[in-house]
Regions:
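Short, N-terminal intrinsically disordered low-complexity segments that are rich in Pro/Gly
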Residues: 6-10, 40, 77-81
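Iron-sulfur-associated redox domains of electron-transfer enzymes in respiratory
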Residues: 61-267
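Acidic/polar N-terminal loop/beta-strand segments that form early-domain functional surfaces
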Residues: 30, 42, 105-107
Length: 267
């Protein structure tokens, strides 16, 4: 059983892993650190579910709306701690006020990035700000489906390929209370490059990373430099963001992106 013909045809959304009825698929990093599905042939029953669900290869439900809005949150501090105008905060507040759940990308203790679930503003605030590294989806799609089946309002934020993967995974599930939000994505860099960059910073400044910000606004709203805190001492750098904007560290499928157009899969 082969899920994808080449690495340029797999975005790493993990829908195939989460749909497998036998749990035969695991997401494993390759030599560049990107996660790809690997099949345990001793468990696989060759049902083909993993191939059928792939939105990257089989197409996705497009949102043909061409209406555009400019949004600016009323609260300055909320805007300042967000990537831009803090539209995400306002939208997710609506869901949280309805006792719903919000899903997004958050730093973990080791500064890797994973999608997690939030039902309060404290956890939701971990989703604020840019994350220039691909997030590990884990079992997020399963959790979203469970929330919807429990009649909860749900907001999912992520890259366009992650949104498309989620919608394919949900299939005929009632999505009337699902709100999806994708970002204007520049591509997803390798988690291992980010990990090695942090090691480089720790060696250079002789300490441990305690905080990271990919778009530090204290030196200007339009800045494209990262801020790394070593033992709580702040350093303004541009090595990692330079590689990112030069398109040197993105996932192979990002150079073959099916969603880089105005017909986005999200709401």
């Amino acid at each position: 059983m082969q899920i994808f013909p080449s690495k340029s045809e797999c975005c790493g959304c993990s829908a195939c892993k989460q749909i497998c009825p036998k749990g035969a698929i695991a997401m494993k990093p390759d030599s560049e650190g990107f996660l790809y599905p690997q099949i345990d042939v001793s468990l696989c029953i060759e049902c083909g579910a993993c191939q059928k669900i792939c939105a990257f290869q089989n197409g996705y439900e497009k949102n043909h709306s061409k209406t555009a809005y400019a949004i600016k949150h009323k609260d300055f501090n909320t805007r300042f701690t967000s990537r831009s105008g803090a539209a995400f905060v306002a939208l997710s507040d609506y869901i949280l006020n309805k006792k719903g759940s919000v899903y997004g990308a958050a730093f973990q203790d080791d500064f890797s990035v994973s999608h997690i679930r939030a039902t309060d503003r404290y956890v939701r605030d971990k989703f604020k700000g840019s994350k220039y590294v691909q997030s590990d989806m884990k079992d997020t799609f399963k959790s979203v489906k469970n929330d919807l089946n429990n009649d909860m309002y749900v907001m999912f934020s992520g890259t366009a390929c992650q949104v498309a993967g989620l919608k394919r995974y949900l299939g005929k599930c009632d999505t009337s209370k699902l709100y999806t939000c994708d970002i204007a994505c520049h591509g997803v860099p390798s988690p291992i490059i980010w990990k090695e960059y942090l090691k480089h910073c720790e060696k250079k400044f002789c300490g441990k990373v305690t905080k990271a910000d990919f778009r530090d606004k204290t030196i200007g709203w339009n800045t494209h430099k990262e801020a790394i805190w070593i033992d709580d001492n702040k350093h303004i750098l541009n090595g990692y963001t330079y590689l990112f904007y030069e398109d040197d560290i993105e996932r192979p499928s990002c150079y073959n992106c099916k969603y880089s157009n105005i017909d986005r899969p999200a709401d």
